[in-house]
UniProtKB/Swiss-Prot annotation:
Gene3D superfamilies: Ribosomal protein S10 domain (3.30.70.600). The lineage of its organism: Bacteria, Pseudomonadati, Pseudomonadota, Alphaproteobacteria, Hyphomonadales. SUPFAM superfamilies: Ribosomal protein S10 (SSF54999). GO terms for cellular component: ribonucleoprotein complex; ribosome. Keywords: Ribonucleoprotein, Ribosomal protein. Belongs to the universal ribosomal protein uS10 family. It comes from Hyphomonas neptunium (strain ATCC 15444). This is Small ribosomal subunit protein uS10.
């Protein structure tokens, strides 16, 4: 029988909230007896925007903004039913996006 993996991908603008959420998921999974790989930090995606400061003239006067998106990946290897139930009941902080995929073992 093929083993199952749960791959969890976390995204957030604030890296502290992201790390706290990842730590909470790892603690929950380990408490229920599952093996956890990660969190693995992926490269930070930086989007930069340059806008004119004034609405009319002064092309040379500009302002720059950036958005940093931090990403982490966790793999839960061969989860138990208790692990899945505990992860479903887990309440993560706001501002952290979570994407869960169920896949076969590699």
């Amino acid at each position: 029988m093929e083993r199952q993996n749960i791959r969890i991908r976390l995204k957030a603008f604030d890296h502290r909230a992201l790390d706290m959420s990842a730590k909470e998921i790892v603690n929950t999974a380990k408490r229920t007896g599952a093996e956890v790989r990660g969190p693995v930090p992926l490269p930070t995606r930086i989007e930069r925007f340059t806008v004119n400061r004034s609405p009319h003239i002064d092309k040379k006067s500009r302002e720059q903004f950036e958005i940093r998106t931090h990403t982490r990946i966790l793999d839960i290897v061969d989860p138990t039913p208790q692990t899945v139930d505990a992860l479903m009941k887990l309440d993560l902080s706001s501002g952290v996006g979570i994407e869960i995929k169920l896949e076969g073992a590699r």
